[in-house]
C-alpha cells in the first residue's frame, strides 16, 4: 500500500463525518459477509456511511456509493498475562451481583480469556493509500483535528450490534404495580412474626411469600429442576385473585421482592411499608435471610452451562469442519434461530434462492445492505455453506488450545440477520428465548413477503389441508381447504406403553416431595408414533355446530386430511400444552420417530359419490336458541339492538364469554380472544386456543373483530375518503391488483403500512377471491394482475418420506431452555450445538420437537 499524502487527505476531507448519537456504526461485522476486525483482512469502516466491509466487498461499496475514505481495523488476539495472585492466566473474575448486562455489578460480556492488539489506519480507495492513526501529527491542524475527531468518535462509539444485543439490559428494572396504591387489605389480620415462618399448606420453610391482602404465607413456584416450592402461593392467587405478595426473608429497610400475579412480573410497591405494617411488620427492623429472586436467577444463569440433556455430552464426538459444517454463535438465547436456519439452508431450494444467486442479490442491494432482507439471508446462507468460517478456534499465543476448545469453531454470529428478522416484532426483537416453531413460521412469512413475484423456496413446505365436517343429524358434509406449512401431531398420553411405570414413578415422586427426599430416577412416557398419527386423523366431535341444512345447531364430526403432500414435511410434536389450570406445561415424552414415513393413508378424497353437501348459507348473526343482550353485549332488551362496543352491527354474534375470559386471563388481547371464539364458531376453549396460537403473528391479531359486510370500528372517515392514489400505486407496484390494494387500504383506514401487513395476512383469501372472479366470467386484467398467482402454489407427490433433520428442545417451557439440531449429511447424522458441530453417535430421535422429512423419490 502507498503512503497517504496530505493532498489526498484534503481531497476527501469534506466526506468525512463524525458519528452522532443516532448514527448506527457497523464496526464489528461486514455488511455482506461475516468478516470482522479479527479476520485476516480486517474490516474497513466507511467514514461517511459508517458501514463496515471486509476486504472482498469494500470496493463494491466504493464503486456503488462513492465515498473513498475508510477506517481500517485489524485486531489480533494474545493471551492475557498471568495474574500472580491467582496462579492462572485469568484475572480474578468479579461475581455478578445484578441480573443485568453492561451495568455496574452485572454480567460483563467484554470479559475474555485473551487481549486484543488493535491496528488502526486511514485508507483512501481505490489506490489503498494509507496512514496510521498515530501518523497524523505532521498534517495541518484543521486536517488533523477533523480526521482525529472522526477516528476517535468511531472507535469509541457503541457498535450497532452491541446496541442491539445489550442495550444496557437490566433485569432488575421494575415498574410500580398498578395495585400499589389501591390494594385492599382484609380487616383484623393475624400478626406476622419476624421469623420462623412456614407455608400454611405444607411444611416448607424457605421460598415463602406473604400475600399482602389476607396475610397468608405460602410457598413459591416449583422450578424446572424440581427445586423451589409447591406452587401454593400462585394457587392461592388463582382461588382468591389477591394480586400482590412479598417474599419473606428479603424484607429490609431498603425494600423487598414484591411479585404481582396479575401483572405476572416482579414489581415495585411504594406503599410496601404501610402494607407490611398492616400485619405488624416493621420494615426498619427486618433483615435479609433469604436469596432474592435476582440472586436465584443469576445462580441459574451461571449453572446453565451444566446442561447435558440431548447434547450427547457423555459421548466423545468427532468435531467437523468445512463447507456445510459451520456453527453459529449463541447471541444470548438465540439457539432457536440457529437451529431453524441451519435446517433451512440444508435444503436445496433455499440454497438455490439465496446462495447460488448471491452475486446478483448483492449487486441489487440498496445503499444500506444491513436493512435488506434478501441480502442478509444470502449472507447468512453463504456464511453457513462456504466453509470460510468453519475453522477451529484460533490458537493462543503459545500455539495451544484449551481442551474444551478443540471441538469448538469460531463459526458465525448472525447479528445483522437477527436484528432485521426481529425488527418490529414484540418477541423476536428481544433477547428472550423463543419457540422454534413460532420462529420458523415467522421466517416463512418474511420469505413469503419478499418473494411475491419471484422464485419462492417456501413451496417445499407448503401443502393444502382438507377439512371435512359432517352434520350427524342430516349426514350432509362440507369440504374446505386451507394452506399450511406444519403438521401438528398430537400426543395421546393415554396410549403410553409404560403406564404402570409412570404411575409408580408419580407416586414415588409425590412421596419424595412430601418427605423432602431426593426425587426418583425419571420415568419418561413412551408413546408410539402410530398412536400420534391415529390421533391426528381421528374424527373430532364439534358440539354446537350450526347446520345450514337444519338452520339450527347440531353435532358434527370433523376429519383432517392432506389435499397435497409437500416436498418437505415438517412435523411439530405438540409437547407444549396447557394443564387444567391453563398453566403452560411440557409433556415429558419419548416418541420413536421412524426413519421412513408413509402417510399416503392421510390423503384426502374430496366429495365422494353419494355424499351431499351442506347448503352454502351464512349462519345468522344471532342464533335462535341464544338469548339476546347477553355475554357482555349492549342494548335495550325491548329492542332488537344488541351490539358489542367493538362491533358495528346492531345484531352482533353471541360469543361464549366463558371461553373469552379464559383466554384473556392467559394474557391474550380481548379483541383477539373475541375473534378466536367467533372464527371457531363457539366450539370451545381448545379450538379457540388453537386459533390464537395459529394467528399470534398476524399483523391484525389484536385488532377489533370486523364482521363480514360491516365497515368495522372507526371506518366512517375512511369510507368517506377514497384511498390515496399514491398508496394504491405503491401496493400495485408490489405485484398486487388494484382491487386488492383498494380493499386493503379501506380495511385499514387508508394506512399504507397497515394495508401492506393486512394484504399479506389475507393473501390466501384474496387469491381465492380473484380465482372466483375469473371463474365467474371477469377477465384476468379486471380481477388480478398477471404477476399474482391464482391461489397458493403447492407441490404434490407421493406421501413417502425419509427423516433428514430434527430440532430438539431442553427445558420446561419454550420461553426457557436450549435448542440443538441434528441434520443428516453425507449419510451420517451431525449435531449442531451452537459453535459445536460434531458427528453424532446417538442422535436422540425420540426426544425431538420439530422433525423435517424429505420426500422419497418413487
Curated annotation (Swiss-Prot):
InterPro entries: Papain-like_cys_pep_sf, Peptidase_C19_UCH, Ub_carboxyl-term_hydrolase, UBA, UBA-like_sf, Ubiquitinyl_hydrolase, UBP13_Znf-UBP_var, UBP5_UBA1. Keywords: Acetylation, Cytoplasm, Disulfide bond, Hydrolase, Isopeptide bond, Metal-binding, Nucleus, Phosphoprotein, Protease, Repeat, Thiol protease, Ubl conjugation, Ubl conjugation pathway, Zinc, Zinc-finger. Ubiquitinated by SMURF1; leading to proteasomal degradation. Pfam families: UBA_7, UCH, zf-UBP, zf-UBP_var. The modification Phosphoserine is found at residues 149, 156, 779, 783, 785. Residues 654-695, 722-762 form the UBA domain. The modification N-acetylalanine is found at residue 2. Signal peptide: none annotated. PROSITE patterns: UBA, USP_2, USP_3, ZF_UBP. One of its GO terms (molecular function) is cysteine-type deubiquitinase activity. Its main location: cytoplasm. Residues 326-856 form the USP domain. Its EC number is 3.4.19.12. There is a cross-link at residue 113 (Glycyl lysine isopeptide (Lys-Gly) (interchain with G-Cter in SUMO)). A zinc finger (UBP-type) spans 175-283. It catalyses: Thiol-dependent hydrolysis of ester, thioester, amide, peptide and isopeptide bonds formed by the C-terminal Gly of ubiquitin (a 76-residue protein attached to proteins as an intracellular targeting signal). It comes from the Eukaryota. Transmembrane segments: none annotated. Zn(2+) binds at residues 199, 202, 219, 232. Coiled coil: none annotated. GO terms for biological process: protein deubiquitination; proteolysis. Belongs to the peptidase C19 family. Deubiquitinating enzyme that participates in a wide range of cellular processes by specifically cleaving isopeptide bonds between ubiquitin and substrate proteins or ubiquitin itself. Affects thereby important cellular signaling pathways such as NF-kappa-B, Wnt/beta-catenin, and cytokine production by regulating ubiquitin-dependent protein degradation. Participates in the activation of the Wnt signaling pathway by promoting FOXM1 deubiquitination and stabilization that induces the recruitment of beta-catenin to Wnt target gene promoter. Homodimer. Interacts with TRIML1. This is Ubiquitin carboxyl-terminal hydrolase 5.
Amino acid at each position: 500500500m502507498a503512503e497517504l499524502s496530505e493532498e489526498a487527505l484534503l481531497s476527501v476531507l469534506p466526506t468525512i463525518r463524525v458519528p452522532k448519537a443516532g448514527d448506527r456504526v457497523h464496526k464489528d461485522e461486514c455488511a455482506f459477509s461475516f468478516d470482522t476486525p479479527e479476520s485476516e483482512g480486517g474490516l474497513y469502516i466507511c467514514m461517511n456511511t459508517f458501514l463496515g466491509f471486509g476486504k472482498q466487498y469494500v470496493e463494491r461499496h466504493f464503486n456503488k456509493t462513492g465515498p473513498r475514505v475508510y477506517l481500517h481495523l485489524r485486531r489480533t488476539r494474545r493471551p492475557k498475562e498471568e495474574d500472580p495472585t491467582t496462579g492462572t492466566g485469568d484475572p480474578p473474575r468479579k461475581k455478578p451481583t445484578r441480573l443485568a448486562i453492561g451495568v455496574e455489578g452485572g454480567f460483563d460480556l467484554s470479559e475474555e480469556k485473551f487481549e486484543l492488539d488493535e491496528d488502526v489506519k486511514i485508507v483512501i480507495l481505490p489506490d489503498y493509500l494509507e496512514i496510521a492513526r498515530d501518523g497524523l501529527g505532521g498534517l495541518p491542524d484543521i486536517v488533523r483535528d477533523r480526521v482525529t475527531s472522526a477516528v476517535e468518535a468511531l472507535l469509541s462509539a457503541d457498535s450497532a450490534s452491541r446496541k442491539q444485543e445489550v442495550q444496557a439490559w437490566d433485569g432488575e428494572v421494575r415498574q410500580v404495580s398498578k395495585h400499589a396504591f389501591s390494594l385492599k387489605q382484609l380487616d383484623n389480620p393475624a400478626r406476622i412474626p419476624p421469623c420462623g415462618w412456614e407455608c400454611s399448606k405444607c411444611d416448607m420453610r424457605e421460598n415463602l411469600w406473604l400475600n399482602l391482602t389476607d396475610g397468608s404465607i405460602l410457598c413459591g413456584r416449583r422450578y424446572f429442576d424440581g427445586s423451589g416450592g409447591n406452587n401454593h402461593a400462585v394457587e392461592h392467587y388463582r382461588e382468591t385473585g389477591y394480586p400482590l405478595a412479598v417474599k419473606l426473608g428479603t424484607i429490609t429497610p431498603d425494600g423487598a421482592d414484591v411479585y404481582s400475579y396479575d401483572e405476572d412480573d416482579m414489581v415495585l410497591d411504594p406503599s410496601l411499608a404501610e402494607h407490611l405494617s398492616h400485619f405488624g411488620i416493621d420494615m426498619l427492623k427486618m433483615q435479609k435471610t433469604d436469596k432474592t429472586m435476582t440472586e436465584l436467577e443469576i445462580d441459574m444463569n451461571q449453572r446453565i452451562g451444566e446442561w447435558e440433556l440431548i447434547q450427547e455430552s457423555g459421548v466423545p464426538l468427532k468435531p467437523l469442519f468445512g463447507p456445510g459444517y459451520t456453527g453459529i454463535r449463541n447471541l444470548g438465547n438465540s439457539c432457536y434461530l440457529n437451529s431453524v436456519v441451519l435446517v433451512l439452508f440444508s435444503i436445496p431450494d433455499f440454497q438455490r434462492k439465496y446462495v447460488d444467486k448471491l452475486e446478483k442479490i448483492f449487486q441489487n442491494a440498496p445503499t444500506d445492505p444491513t436493512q435488506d432482507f434478501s441480502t442478509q439471508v444470502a449472507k447468512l446462507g453463504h456464511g453457513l455453506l462456504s466453509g470460510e468460517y468453519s475453522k477451529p478456534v484460533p490458537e493462543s499465543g503459545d500455539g495451544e488450545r484449551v481442551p474444551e476448545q478443540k471441538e469448538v469453531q469460531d463459526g458465525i454470529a448472525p447479528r445483522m440477520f437477527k436484528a432485521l428478522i426481529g425488527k418490529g416484532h414484540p418477541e423476536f426483537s428481544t433477547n428472550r428465548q423463543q419457540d422454534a416453531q413460532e420462529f420458523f413460521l415467522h421466517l416463512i412469512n418474511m420469505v413469503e413477503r419478499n418473494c411475491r413475484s419471484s422464485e419462492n423456496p417456501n413451496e417445499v413446505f407448503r401443502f393444502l389441508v382438507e377439512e371435512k365436517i359432517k352434520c350427524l343429524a342430516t349426514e350432509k358434509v362440507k369440504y374446505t381447504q386451507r394452506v399450511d406449512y406444519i403438521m401438528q401431531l398430537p400426543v395421546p398420553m393415554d396410549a403410553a406403553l409404560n403406564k404402570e411405570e409412570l404411575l409408580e414413578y408419580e407416586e414415588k415422586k409425590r412421596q419424595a416431595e412430601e418427605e423432602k427426599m431426593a426425587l426418583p430416577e425419571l420415568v419418561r412416557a413412551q408413546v408410539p408414533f402410530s398412536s400420534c398419527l391415529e390421533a391426528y386423523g381421528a374424527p373430532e366431535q364439534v358440539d354446537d355446530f350450526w347446520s345450514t341444512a337444519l338452520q339450527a345447531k347440531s353435532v358434527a364430526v370433523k376429519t383432517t386430511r392432506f389435499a397435497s403432500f409437500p416436498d418437505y414435511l415438517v412435523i411439530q410434536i405438540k409437547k407444549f400444552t396447557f394443564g387444567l389450570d391453563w398453566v403452560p406445561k411440557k409433556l415429558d415424552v419419548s416418541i420413536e420417530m421412524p426413519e421412513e414415513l408413509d402417510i399416503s393413508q392421510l390423503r384426502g378424497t374430496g366429495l365422494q359419490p353419494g355424499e351431499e353437501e351442506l347448503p352454502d348459507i351464512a349462519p345468522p348473526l344471532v342464533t335462535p336458541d341464544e338469548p339476546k343482550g347477553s355475554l357482555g353485549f349492549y342494548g335495550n332488551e325491548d329492542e332488537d339492538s344488541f351490539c358489542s362496543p367493538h362491533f358495528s352491527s346492531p345484531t352482533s354474534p353471541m360469543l361464549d364469554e366463558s371461553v373469552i375470559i379464559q383466554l384473556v386471563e392467559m394474557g391474550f388481547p380481548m379483541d383477539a380472544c373475541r375473534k378466536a371464539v367467533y372464527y371457531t364458531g363457539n366450539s370451545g376453549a381448545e379450538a379457540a386456543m388453537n386459533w390464537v396460537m395459529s394467528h399470534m403473528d398476524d399483523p391484525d391479531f389484536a385488532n377489533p373483530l370486523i364482521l363480514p359486510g360491516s365497515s368495522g370500528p372507526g371506518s366512517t372517515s375512511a369510507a368517506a375518503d377514497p384511498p390515496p392514489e399514491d398508496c394504491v400505486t405503491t401496493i400495485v407496484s408490489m405485484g398486487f391488483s388494484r382491487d386488492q390494494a383498494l380493499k386493503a387500504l379501506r380495511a385499514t383506514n387508508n394506512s399504507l403500512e397497515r394495508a401492506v401487513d393486512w394484504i399479506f395476512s389475507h393473501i390466501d383469501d384474496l387469491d381465492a377471491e380473484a380465482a372466483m372472479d375469473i371463474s365467474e366470467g371477469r377477465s384476468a386484467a379486471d380481477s388480478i394482475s398477471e404477476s399474482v398467482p391464482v391461489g397458493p402454489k403447492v407441490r404434490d407427490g407421493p406421501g413417502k418420506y425419509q427423516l433428514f433433520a430434527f430440532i430438539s428442545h431442553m427445558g420446561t417451557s419454550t420461553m426457557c431452555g436450549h435448542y440443538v439440531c441434528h441434520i443428516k449429511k453425507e449419510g451420517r447424522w451431525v449435531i449442531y450445538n451452537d459453535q459445536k458441530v460434531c458427528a453424532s453417535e446417538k442422535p436422540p430421535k425420540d426426544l425431538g420437537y420439530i422433525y423435517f422429512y424429505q420426500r422419497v423419490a418413487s
